[in-house]
């Protein structure tokens, strides 16, 4: 069985997707449902998918859990927690009675949108992420280069939590800029409790003029 580890679905009539900013994203500023996804992956050899939160909104995760419970295409859900909040684990507990809770496999916060580049090394973040590990949940790291130092420190502080680095931390592919990303990713790779999703590369390249050779140095 082949499971794709990262897909998003959304309904713009239910909530806005605040990250869809600028003309470049106009082609995807439309609803994208699980059936749209099913059609898109036809013939790709993908049997199931993990759906991942898209917004910092506690209402979205219950919807994704219900989707997982009702559609066999969904193998798991990565839900949302504001991971630096004192009540983050209480919010996690609030998911437990919900339909589809058994499909919750991980948690993500959109850390790269926060101005504080040390966000992921906050003591409360460390505490909450350690608790995720005790509960058998993965923490998805959504970072860019400025946030990687804190991400590395978090992974080191939580040896019993498994981490997934999303989108190889969004290096500056369009600028062919390897540093400090290359040193950071090498250090992160030395830690046994983290893996990486090779995803989201095209969005960091020159959208109109990219070629496959642009990506080789980052892989």
Describe the function of each predicted region.
Residues 1-10, 14, 42, 123-124, ...:
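A generic "structured core" feature
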Residues 75-79, 162-167:
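Short hydrophobic/aromatic-enriched beta-strand-loop microsegments
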Residues 27, 31, 89, 122-126, ...:
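Non-membrane alpha-helical structural segments and their capping/turn regions in soluble enzymes
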Residues 33-37, 59-62, 88-93, 148-149, ...:
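Alpha-helical scaffolding within the catalytic cores
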Residues 172-219:
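H/E-rich (His + Asp/Glu) clusters that bind or coordinate divalent metals
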